[in-house]
């Protein structure tokens, strides 16, 4: 649902039709290169800085797209090496990789881990190349990633790397940014699209709770507040919001 559709809407937002412009159906099953509705099976990348970022920020959308028969890939920039107090980087990474694998089983996504280090992410020529080559190899139709204006440096680095890849790959995929703890981490986030996640909310929570080391019972309160607020914006109980990156100049209706 985009901003214009939201403004025109007179009833409760319904799951179905499209998600970020992609056809979805609640009972779709994979069928070769097509989904159950007969539409072309698309590839969607959700690129997060840490294990748990894609799940908390766009986990509901991933579930909806995977259920519709689309190829959903969870890409983690780091292995969350600095994310467990008292554990070494290697110990924490081993734990968080398993948690991420379990979460992907819930959302229906496959996973890819990149080579950056939690808390020490970089934006340089080598890292630009690494991200660009991964996205080029996967050849997605849509990429979802962090809003680059973020108080968490790892989030900001991730968004910047993906944005650069989008430009250098001739904008051949649609790029959507998601929010993370808006106001605390994501700053000045201005959504263009909303996704009603009521039907998969419990499953999103299950995926997030796979990240046991992150104490989701406390952390998720921020995300639950965002889900509720974005739901109020589009007249449903829970939603995820996205900002589409487009170089097109705005035009009158």
Residue map of PLM features:
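ATP-dependent adenylation/pyrophosphate-handling site
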Residues: 44-51, 55-89
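Glycine-/small-residue-rich active-site loops that bind phosphorylated ligands and cofactors
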Residues: 53-54, 119, 150
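Glycine-rich phosphate-binding loop and adjoining beta1-alpha1-beta2 segment
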Residues: 87-107
């Amino acid at each position: 649902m985009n901003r214009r559709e939201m403004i025109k809407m007179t009833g409760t937002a319904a799951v179905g039709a499209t998600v970020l412009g992609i056809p979805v159906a609640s009972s779709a099953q994979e069928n070769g290169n097509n989904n159950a509705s007969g539409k072309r099976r698309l590839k969607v990348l959700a690129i997060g800085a840490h294990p748990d970022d894609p799940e908390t920020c766009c986990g509901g959308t991933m579930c909806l797209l995977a259920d519709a028969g689309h190829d959903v890939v969870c890409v983690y920039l780091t292995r969350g090496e600095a994310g467990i107090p008292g554990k070494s980087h290697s110990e924490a990474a081993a734990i968080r990789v398993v948690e991420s694998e379990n979460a992907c089983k819930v959302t229906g996504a496959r996973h890819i881990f990149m080579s950056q280090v939690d808390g020490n992410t970089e934006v340089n020529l080598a890292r630009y190349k690494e991200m660009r080559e991964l996205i080029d190899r996967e050849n997605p139709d849509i990429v979802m990633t962090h809003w680059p204006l973020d108080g968490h440096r790892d989030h900001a680095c991730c968004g910047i790397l993906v944005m650069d890849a989008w430009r250098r790959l001739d904008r051949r995929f649609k790029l959507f940014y998601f929010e993370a703890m808006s106001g605390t981490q994501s700053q000045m986030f201005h959504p263009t699209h909303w996704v009603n996640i009521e039907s998969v909310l419990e499953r999103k929570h299950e995926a997030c709770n796979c990240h046991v080391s992150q104490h989701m019972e406390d952390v998720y309160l921020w995300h639950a507040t965002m889900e509720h607020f974005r739901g109020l914006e589009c007249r449903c109980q829970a939603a995820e919001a996205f900002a589409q990156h487009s170089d097109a100049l705005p035009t009158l209706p």
